[in-house]
Regions:
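Conserved ABC ATPase "signature" region
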Residues: 98, 102-125
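Helical segment within the ABC ATPase nucleotide-binding domain
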Residues: 169-181
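Conserved ABC transporter NBD signature motif
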Residues: 58-66, 73-74
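ABC ATPase "signature
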Residues: 213-214
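Catalytic Walker B motif of ABC-type/P-loop ATPase nucleotide-binding domains
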Residues: 154-158
Length: 237
């Protein structure tokens, strides 16, 4: 059974159609990338799937729960990390994870916190205040927060955006490890080079339309290209 099923999804802001009848499926444990330039409709799609935006037409199902009629059920099994997510700067990393954990599971709070600490992998800095963290450290803390709840589906908007090479590499390793344990990952990225390493399948989106989708290697072969950037350019033309 697919974890995510999106069929003919349309999302409008007033008269502007941001997402235009897109469809895709994601299997359990897959890392699926929604890839495209800024303004292509990636974040809107992720916000719809995370139940933050209502759809105008089409359907979305998460593990057979319908987005329109069962959003509360969906919220219990997903985790969403927006690109511009922040953390409480006056708290330590540990205190921040503790604060979040209490919203999810009062009985197993300690276990959940330890899981978040392990994922973030900040060492002794976990007990320092968040406002002393670098951007990469903050992002690792936030990824730990998103994944410590053991969601069935983790939705990550531009998880490595703005990070240096080392921190981006660390985030990619975290995502790979979590997916290997059975969590399904839906992420967005405008970095078309990293998705060849990270994603099992991708969908290329431009101006609200999915213009191509499949396994990165299959797309490279189909379009006789060296990388996904070349594929995207050829498809758009």
């Amino acid at each position: 059974m697919s974890t995510v099923e999106v069929n003919n999804l349309i999302k409008k802001y007033g008269s502007f159609e941001a997402v235009k009848k897109i469809s895709f499926e994601i299997d359990q444990g897959e890392i699926f990338g929604l890839i495209g330039p800024n303004g292509a409709g990636k974040t809107t799609t992720l916000r719809v799937i995370s139940t933050l935006l209502q759809i105008n037409s089409g359907s979305v199902k998460i593990l057979d729960y319908d987005l329109k009629t069962q959003p509360d059920k969906i919220r219990k099994i997903i985790s969403y990390l927006p690109e511009d997510a922040g953390a409480y700067k006056t708290l330590t990393g540990r205190a921040y994870l503790t604060f979040i954990a209490k919203f999810f599971n009062e009985k197993n709070t300690v276990e959940m916190i330890e899981k978040g600490i392990k994922i973030a992998d900040l060492g002794t800095r976990i007990d320092d205040k968040v406002d002393t963290y670098s951007k990469g450290m903050k992002r690792r803390l936030l990824v730990g927060r998103a994944l410590m709840t053991e969601p069935k589906l983790a939705i990550l908007d531009e998880p490595t955006s703005g990070l240096d090479v080392i921190n981006a590499q660390e985030i990619r390793k975290i995502i790979k490890n979590i997916a290997a344990k059975g969590t399904t990952i839906l992420l967005s990225s405008h970095n078309m080079l990293e998705v060849e390493y990270l994603c099992d399948k991708i969908a290329l989106i431009d101006m609200g339309i999915i213009i191509e989708k499949g396994k990165p290697k299959d797309l490279l072969n189909k379009y006789k290209s060296n990388n996904i950037e070349e594929v995207f350019t050829k498809v758009v033309k």
